[in-house]
Design a protein with these regions (language model features):
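Aromatic "clamp/platform" in nucleotide-sugar-dependent glycosyltransferases that forms part
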Residues: 78, 97
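Short hydrophobic beta-strand element within catalytic cores of glycosyltransferases
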Residues: 105, 114-118
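A conserved mid-protein helix/loop that constitutes part of the nucleotide-sugar donor-binding site
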Residues: 15, 19-38, 55-61
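A short helix/loop element that forms part of the nucleotide-sugar donor recognition site in Leloir-type
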Residues: 1-10
């Protein structure tokens, strides 16, 4: 799947930094573009792939154009194949300004994709060694260097067992939910 996705998306021979999320202030796309500009300056074979849409997309596209990065940034729109796309990516970038949980980080870990997220994302999302947290107070250059540590290839490996141990497995989640409901019903009787 990785090779076919990379071929289909034009990612062969590239270092692909991905993101999925609505184009809103919360997701911090403008900072992502600043980070990517620093990455691209140091490693021109990098590509930034955005999945999603939202009211700030045009502003982000204008920023990309202004920085001369149009040929290296892809706007993929709303996607229903993120699992496959993530398998073709090399790293997932998530510098949110605030976040409830950040479920997309869980999805990235499930396919073995390393993620670099802001330290406002709750620690509970880290179920494997594949998540690094960085302060939003750090510069775009600092973030770029953290990303580039992984440019020489990370082997995607299923993290199903890690996720299962962390409680993200449908059968155990269903049992936990059933137990919770039974406790609630028991209290009302």
């Amino acid at each position: 799947t990785r090779h076919s996705i990379r071929s289909k998306m034009g990612w062969n021979g590239k270092f692909v930094i991905g993101h999925a999320g609505r184009f809103t202030e919360q997701k911090n796309h403008k900072f992502m573009v600043e980070i990517f500009a620093k990455v691209h300056e140091k490693y021109p074979e990098a590509i930034l792939a955005f999945a999603g849409d939202g009211h700030l997309m045009d502003e982000v596209k204008a920023q990309v154009k202004e920085l001369g990065l149009t040929d290296s940034v892809q706007f993929l729109g709303v996607r229903f194949d993120m699992n496959e796309l993530m398998q073709g990516m090399d790293i997932f970038l998530f510098p949110s300004l605030y976040e409830g949980l950040g479920n997309v980080i869980t999805e990235a870990q499930a396919v073995g994709l390393r993620s670099i997220a802001s330290d406002v994302v709750p620690n509970e999302v880290k179920m494997t060694e594949l998540v690094d947290f960085i302060s939003l107070n750090k510069s775009a250059d600092f973030w770029a260097d953290a990303i580039l540590k992984y440019k020489d290839g990370y082997i995607h490996k299923s993290r199903h067992d890690d996720l299962k141990k962390a409680g993200y497995e449908i059968k155990s989640a269903a049992r936990d939910l059933e137990k919770y409901y039974l406790e609630l019903v028991g209290r009302k009787m």
